[in-house]
Amino acid sequence: MNRLRLVAIATFLIAYLSGCKSGYDGQLVGAADRPQWDNNLLPYGMVYVPSGTFTTGPSDQDINYSFNAKAKAISINGFYMDETEVTNNEYRQFVYWVKDSIAHMMIGGDHLLEGEDGTQSINWEMPIDWSANSEDAGALESMYYSEADRLYGVKDVDPRKLEYEFSWFLWRDAALRENFNKPRSTFIKKKKVAIYPDTLCWIRDFTYSYNEPMTRSYFSHPAYDDYPVVGVTWDQANAFCGWRTRLWNDNRSKNGEAPVDEFRLPIEHEWEYAARGGRIASPYPWGGPYLRNTKGCLLANFKPGRGNYPEDGGFYTVKSTAYWPNDYGLYNMAGNVAEWTLTAFFENSYSFVHDKNPDIRYDAKDEDPTTLKRKVIRGGSWKDVGYFLQTSTRSWEYQDSTKSYVGFRCVLPFLGRSMSDFN
């Protein structure tokens, strides 16, 4: 028996050593066993925006005389971008995931898996029974509104309980020479965010205006599933991006595939570059200079005249695929909802940002002045006049504000030089 064991071990060692020899043969050939990488990667619902250069800044008259977007030639690295704004139903997937993950943790038992290092993870194979008479009902009771807070006696989940914690790394702080020997944990930031959209923003945004049906139905009713999500803060949009990264990379890891970079909000100039669709000095995503086509039809969802909202076909928001896309295949880069960007708003930022992937950010703290909490929004919305639809127009909102006219879309950095290298 021992002899057979020795023969087996010797055979294994010979095969292993011969494999090493045939794999490298004393030559520099690169490390083996690298993860798989799909050269033709194209995330679902996104379009590829190639690297390029363009002149940012006004393509038409600066009617506000704000002078906060002077002309500047810049270069942008390639990236993927959502072809539409994130819709109610897409954001609802995030809400449901958070709700289910909290429920799994509260139920415990077979709903949790324990790793070799003692850490716990969720067993997503276990179903959750939300019925009132289920075995799980007692453990889940604290997720619901109290009886005094229930409307018509309906037992609804309290959206204030739906919190998601995400983290990010402060790369620029870590790059400072004086921080070279500091522990990695110094640069890891975490934030817990209540992720349910603020449905009351429809009432808050417009005084002496009847918008209660939108508050009751816009996010919850299937009629609006394909409409852009609104009422989300800048932090909520970032939390969504962090969850989306985790969701896809976890799946890729299970399949032995290399991870992708992080989904995130677009940098202001990435957004403008994509909105122009490769056109030069075009004031609108479709070119311009007019807001109507040759038949007199409006080309976006906005406020075309005083007291006139529905002429373009939409009283409020419209479906995320309404109107024609631009030359990159991106829908509603003008109108419908304005969109959050990653960029901090400073009036003079065009004067000092780099000409290669220009970027300026500021991680505002609660105690900071409100002016430091401004984030750039782009594209204009259903309630804005035509000026705000221009590809070069800059505007802003406070990062903790929720508006019925502000949504977002995600981008994903392209890894490599060009998509054409892989064809």
Regions found by a protein language model. Name each.
Residues N89-Y96, V230, D235-G242, E272:
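Solvent-exposed, polar/charged alpha-helical surfaces in well-ordered, non-transmembrane soluble domains
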Residues I267:
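A helicase ATPase "motif cassette" and its flanking acidic/Ser/Thr-rich regulatory loops
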Residues T294-Y328:
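A short, contiguous structural element within a folded domain that forms the immediate neighborhood
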Residues L42-P58:
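Mature N-terminal segment immediately following signal peptide/propeptide cleavage
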Residues M1-G30, W37, A274:
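Bacterial Sec-dependent N-terminal signal peptides
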